[in-house]
């Protein structure tokens, strides 16, 4: 499919995907910025999903490396969650390929209000680490379950995935915000690549658009992860509220337009 993007629109996309990478690395939810941007630029929904996954996967790779380098994650839990996330996201992406553009848009409109309520309800997350450092069968299954559920959501819908992962790791597993964010990065990385492999095999990634956006997303992720690691909860909490505002804004725009 030949997709033409004007130079000013390409510049807009590069800026927006860079900002999306910044937000995503700090608190998740970068897709709330990048997905509407791709759609606004004129990419059809399936191509938007695929190209967004390409740029997001590239950026998340660098953010995950930053959190790993700084020891801001529980690697065992993160890997288990990533395994579940990879399976869930691959399944979700295959389901998306079977749906029409109209169904995808309707699905977003139904699911995003629920997502907004969840984020608003859990906006005041604890910052103390209540995890005892052990990994038993219950925790392992919980990590796999969190990964699969959020991965399925990411493969089918996407926006807010990192934020939901942070909420799950703090609320259900007792991690502080910094560690939960690191675990979320590992989960999200696996989810992004699982979906991306599915979209690549279907030829849906628009590389002339995706490559410059991926570079911008990488830069945004590097800067955002730097701030999140240095500032911790003081930076992550406000960014999560920014994600909530963006999510609610998207809901309003979908309802009006």
Predicted regions and their residues:
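Selected transmembrane alpha-helices and immediately adjacent juxtamembrane segments
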Residues: 1-44, 130-181
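Residues within membrane-spanning alpha-helices of integral membrane proteins
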Residues: 10, 53, 108-112, 116, ...
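Residue-level signature of the transmembrane alpha-helical core
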Residues: 14, 18, 22, 53, ...
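Transmembrane helix-loop junction
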Residues: 40, 93, 97, 106, ...
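Small-residue hotspots at the loop-to-helix junctions and early N-terminal turns
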Residues: 46-50, 181-185
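Selective hydrophobic functional segments
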Residues: 50-103, 107-110, 192-242
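Transmembrane helix exit motif
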Residues: 62-72, 109-135, 248-257
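Hydrophobic alpha-helical transmembrane segments in multi-pass integral membrane proteins
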Residues: 147-157, 195-203, 210, 247-257
